[in-house]
Amino acid sequence: VVSNPEATQRAGNVDEQPDRQTDSTREPGRRATAGDSLAEATPSEKRQLLRGQPDPTGRATGYLPGVDRLGIEPLRFVDGPLGVVDGESTAFPATVALGASWDPELARRFGRALGRETRANGHDIVLAPGANLIRVPTCGRNFEYPGEDPHHAARLTAATVSGIEGTGAGATLKHFVANNQERNRDKLNVVVGERALRELYLPAFRAGVDTGASVVMTAYNRVGGDYASEHRELLETVLRQRWGFDGVTISDWWGTHDTVAAATAGLDVEMPGVSPVARRVPTSRLAWLVERVGLSERLGLSVPLYWRVVDRLVAEDGQPE
């Protein structure tokens, strides 16, 4: 571990801080009541919460602007799986090394440290953990994943999510799903049977959802012909209906190909903004599309889910508990 002393001091001792779930002393901050403003938000203000924008500070990996008129603060997303990619932070060993430890408690402590450094650097959601399996030996991102066994990966993913979420930071499960090679990843079509999908590729994501992950990030690839960001069966039937996921789904960065198709399939947030490869929706036509192609109903679902995540995050000052 390459540990930064200043980061360690600012984030505090990982084991000395109370978990968010059991901390009854924290006063609710501004974000704790953000959902109350939903009824006052205009359709335009709601729409701006569902598409990323550049971070004014230039520090966040992803940024949702909030609504200043209603006192709704922005959400800041930061990479990554091996340590916060901003400011003074710790460079942790690769996730595959964590997998080799066979130690869920170590994974929880890792997640807790990652979450605390996320908060200490002024961010809300960390883009971790990676929950894909190691299936292709030449995959360039195998180091981000816990291993090749679905049960083992599920245990470590759940523990990491528990650690992150316990600090008040949000965890992001990625990349949903079957993103197991990097070559041609934005065009690749993964053909996988239902049994293999359930037994191999989904367990780690299911474990992370059951543990309370705030965000799920879709993969670049197609699954059975449909892009993961436009896959209604995965986003709605599996994630929402079967698993009961109540957080927010986001695309991988520039991972959408059709804004309307993604939104109607169940994707909540397009990151980091309008994709350069997507079929774009001009602002002048967006309101029309919202009403004409069923996006108003999707907007009514996505925005409350956004608030649910906002309300789970702590401390208006951006500091950990």
Give the residues covered by each predicted segment:
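Glycoside hydrolase catalytic-domain context in secreted enzymes
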Residues: 1-321
